[in-house]
Amino acid sequence: MRTVVDYGAAIAFGVAYFVTKDFQKATWVLVAASAAALAIGYAVERRLAMLPLFFGGMALVFGTLGLIFGSDVFVKIKVTVINLALASFLVGGVLLKRQPLKVIMGEALHLPDAAWRTLTLRYGAYFAFVAIINEVVRNTQDTDTWVKFRLALLPVALVFVATQLPFMMKHMAKGDDAKAVEPPDAGF
């Protein structure tokens, strides 16, 4: 269910675009699917988790701007803005001696601070890379290619996460060595 909420709007957008070949109609689907994903997420969890709220909110804002102005630029730059924001948040947090990824994922993982720092920098670099590549594709390719690229980012993200699993497993605290992590509630 969580995967549907997290990726459903992007997949619905891609399907709508390739069925209709109309970016505006696909943007309507993106906006509606993003709103539905937030509603489903709230209905299931009785709260809006921070990241789905961020992604859904950005899709609603940029999708709505695209519809109002009749331009595909807003939806296309959404990928850049989101990924730059995440990269800045993560890398900036490390520079300020904070552990932003630990706050977000701390309940699920118990890692030493040095491992959190490394993992945070890796995620920050990944998000910065995606933002840069999106700008290259957005500015050099046609809309069909950009939509294919956007859909390809979904499995690429899963592969990136999978490549981090060995590092996380290696550094996970075991048994009595695990510290009880009490990050702030990420829900709203």
Swiss-Prot record:
Pfam families: IspA
Transmembrane segments: 23-43, 49-69, 73-93, 116-133, 149-169
Main localisation: membrane
Record's keyword terms, sorted: Cell inner membrane, Cell membrane, Membrane, Transmembrane, Transmembrane helix
Subcellular location: Cell inner membrane
Cited function: Plays a role in cell envelope biogenesis, maintenance of cell envelope integrity and membrane homeostasis.
Name assigned to this protein: Inner membrane-spanning protein YciB
Organism this protein belongs to: Caulobacter vibrioides (strain ATCC 19089 / CIP 103742 / CB 15) (Caulobacter crescentus)
Name of the encoding gene: yciB
